[in-house]
Amino acid sequence: GPKTISIKSMADLAGKTVAATRGALEDQELTKVAPAGTEIKRFEDNNATVSAFVAGQTQLLATGVSVAGVMMQKNPQLNTEYKLLLKDSPNFIGVAKGEDALRTKVNAIIADGKKSGDIDKMAQKWLGRPAGQLPE
């Protein structure tokens, strides 16, 4: 949401309007934790959700970090920032059973990226924030 709105905890969502994509992880998690008085406006897809927020139809936006990062890059005039983490849901890389050499190589590349700081640099560049704690 905009830097002008102070949101430090879930309780601060009371009295606010929040855009969310109907049925998405963010909608489900927000519905669980939003206090009474939070108005969740649901939209059919990410594009409609982001468009509604950008157009000022809601005060806040509940979405994944990759969607939020692109929205913030494309709309710097909104002066937005990350507010709260609804759920930490990392992405994973799937490797077919029996592909032990490939899995080992992928894990080594990820470990090297974590150690060198390259993963955090890429996350900062593309998502506007560090990668955070990654699973082992």
Q: Where are the language model's segments positioned?
A:
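A ligand-binding cleft/hinge motif common to bilobed small-molecule-binding domains
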Residues: E29-V33, V54, Q59-K87
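Small-molecule pocket liners
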Residues: K16, T38, S89-I93
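Flexible hinge/capping segments at coil-to-helix
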Residues: G1-T17
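Beta->alpha turn/N-cap motifs
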Residues: G1-P2, G23-L25, D45-N46, A62-G69, ...
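Periplasmic-binding protein-like
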Residues: G69-A111, R129-E136
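Hydrophobic residues within well-ordered alpha-helices
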Residues: L13, A52-V54, V106
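Short helix-initiation/N-cap motifs at beta->coil->alpha
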Residues: I5-S6, K41-A55, K87-S89
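Ligand-binding clefts/hinges and TM-proximal coupling segments of bilobed small-molecule sensing domains
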Residues: L25-I40, T80, I110-E136
